[in-house]
């Protein structure tokens, strides 16, 4: 019997396919341009190169990004709090298919429980679904210390001061409704215990990795200072911040009263 393996899917798979198709059309226009003369040649070549820069670049780049991410595990530094806090309650907001949530759950050696919520959009992640993440947790042997359910980042379905750690990994920039990130951080503050930790990772629009992966679409991401100011605005104290692998990473604390 064939061994079943977890399926984590690709981030923005549909975008990658769409961009790549349009980009390949641009490549075709560029090649055909050399078979014409004068203004038609120039028009086809310029149009083709433009389409390749705008679409083929990020299409291929985000494909490479997914391959790189599939081969990476969270470092001990990124999951340190799971070891330090005794029996922590952890929430991963926007858990998707569980790529990071399940890695965190594997670090829970001394009790504790990881919860994950998502709206399970297949636009964000290919194959994204509640039954997918639950199946992945079972196959990875952590279904006894994980709970996954539907839930929105701007209306988190848990009680006040319930969690020791809350994660937002590449989620806040996806909240396109007015005041979305503000509402999400208000919710994070509400559900965190005093002294609890907020962990945020967001793509850094200025990093060479993000530019290589996303091309001109790197501009959809915010600058470092935006996230820093937003975190402080909502009452958190930033403990650590760093830029690594194309991302801003923040570790902040909800002050004890």
Where are these regions (language model features)?
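Class I SAM-dependent methyltransferase Rossmann-like catalytic core
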Residues: 8, 13-15, 42, 52-82
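A short acidic, Gly/Pro-enriched loop at the edge of an enzyme's catalytic core
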Residues: 85, 154-166
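Class I SAM-dependent methyltransferase SAM/SAH-binding core
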Residues: 91, 99-154
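Helix-to-beta-strand junctions that scaffold the AdoMet/dcAdoMet cofactor pocket
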Residues: 108-109, 175-176, 192-194
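Short alpha-helix
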Residues: 133, 219-235
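A short glycine-rich, Lys/Arg-flanked "PGG" loop and its adjoining helix->strand segment in the class I
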Residues: 182-194
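Conserved beta-strand signature within the Rossmann-like core of class I S-adenosyl-L-methionine
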Residues: 195-202
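Core SAM-dependent methyltransferase catalytic element
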Residues: 234-257
């Amino acid at each position: 019997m064939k061994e079943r393996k977890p399926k984590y899917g690709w981030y923005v798979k549909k975008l990658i396919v769409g961009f790549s198709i349009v980009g390949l059309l641009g490549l075709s226009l560029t090649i055909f341009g050399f078979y014409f003369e004068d203004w038609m040649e120039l028009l086809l070549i310029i149009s083709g190169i433009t389409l390749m820069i705008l679409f083929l670049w990020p299409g291929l780049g985000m494909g490479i990004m997914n391959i790189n991410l599939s081969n990476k595990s969270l470092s001990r530094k990124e999951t340190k709090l799971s070891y330090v806090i005794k029996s922590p309650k952890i929430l991963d907001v926007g858990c998707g298919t569980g790529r990071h949530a399940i890695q965190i759950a594997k670090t829970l050696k001394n009790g504790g429980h990881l919860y994950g919520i998502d709206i399970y959009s297949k636009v964000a992640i290919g194959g994204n679904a509640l039954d997918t993440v639950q199946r992945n947790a079972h196959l990875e042997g952590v279904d006894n210390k994980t709970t996954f359910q539907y839930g929105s980042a701007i209306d988190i379905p848990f009680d006040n001061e319930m969690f020791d750690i809350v994660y937002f990994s590449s989620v806040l920039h996806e909240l396109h409704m007015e005041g979305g990130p503000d509402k999400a951080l208000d919710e994070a503050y509400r559900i965190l215990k005093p002294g609890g930790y907020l962990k945020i990772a967001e793509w850094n629009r200025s990093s060479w990795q993000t530019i290589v992966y996303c091309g001109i679409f790197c501009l959809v991401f915010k600058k470092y200072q935006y996230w820093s100011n937003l975190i402080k605005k909502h009452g958190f104290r930033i403990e650590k911040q760093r830029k690594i692998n194309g991302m801003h990473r923040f570790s902040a604390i909800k002050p004890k009263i």
